[in-house]
């Protein structure tokens, strides 16, 4: 009987150390759309030039609870006259419960895996904003967050080597 209780207690500890990953919530943290040259932008020939900026951040907000934010900024100018057609910005966020990972695994999960889950939502928000501004669809391509994460780690490693 005592042996069964010890095994149950040890099993409980194993359960606490097991990998836990769940998306708790997805939400828009910040959203903005500006069309500073409307309505004149609609009266000229429109040959868009798209500038895209993408950034990810993350922070711990509770025990085993992390907020990850994917910020997408799309600025479109008209090649004909250089006027800004629109500026759309979305901060798509998610709350993730994560436990049982090493520090390196956690950093990778927060820096690549979670942003990969959030990006389709950010892309949809940008597309909705552009559509409501009555501009042609802005089809954002998928993003290789794994590659971005690898580049970031490489830069950090090189910076650490150069600091020594």
Curated annotation (Swiss-Prot):
Single GO molecular function: unfolded protein binding
InterPro entries reported for this sequence: SecB, SecB-like_sf
Signal sequence annotation: none
Keyword tags: Chaperone, Cytoplasm, Protein transport, Translocation, Transport
Subcellular location field: Cytoplasm
UniProt keyword Protein transport present: yes
Protein purpose: One of the proteins required for the normal export of preproteins out of the cell cytoplasm. It is a molecular chaperone that binds to a subset of precursor proteins, maintaining them in a translocation-competent state. It also specifically binds to its receptor SecA.
PANTHER family on file: PROTEIN-EXPORT PROTEIN SECB (PTHR36918:SF1), PTHR36918
Family: Belongs to the SecB family.
Protein name as catalogued: Protein-export protein SecB
Source organism (scientific name): Chromohalobacter salexigens (strain ATCC BAA-138 / DSM 3043 / CIP 106854 / NCIMB 13768 / 1H11)
């Amino acid at each position: 009987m005592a042996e069964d209780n010890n095994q149950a207690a040890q099993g409980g500890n194993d359960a606490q150390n097991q990998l836990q990953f769940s998306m708790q919530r997805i939400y828009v943290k910040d959203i903005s759309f500006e069309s500073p040259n409307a309505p004149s932008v609609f009266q000229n020939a429109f040959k868009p030039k798209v500038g895209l900026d993408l950034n990810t951040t993350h922070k711990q907000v509770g025990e085993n609870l992390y907020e990850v934010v994917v910020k997408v900024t799309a600025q479109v100018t008209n090649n004909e006259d250089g006027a800004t057609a629109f500026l759309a910005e979305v901060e798509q966020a998610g709350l993730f419960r994560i436990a049982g990972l090493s520090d390196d695994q956690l950093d990778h999960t927060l820096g690549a895996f979670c942003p990969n889950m959030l990006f389709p939502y950010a892309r949809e928000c940008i597309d909705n904003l552009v559509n409501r501004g009555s501009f042609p669809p802005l089809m954002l391509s998928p993003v290789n967050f794994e590659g971005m994460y690898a580049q970031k780690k490489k830069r950090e490693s090189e910076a650490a080597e150069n600091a020594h």
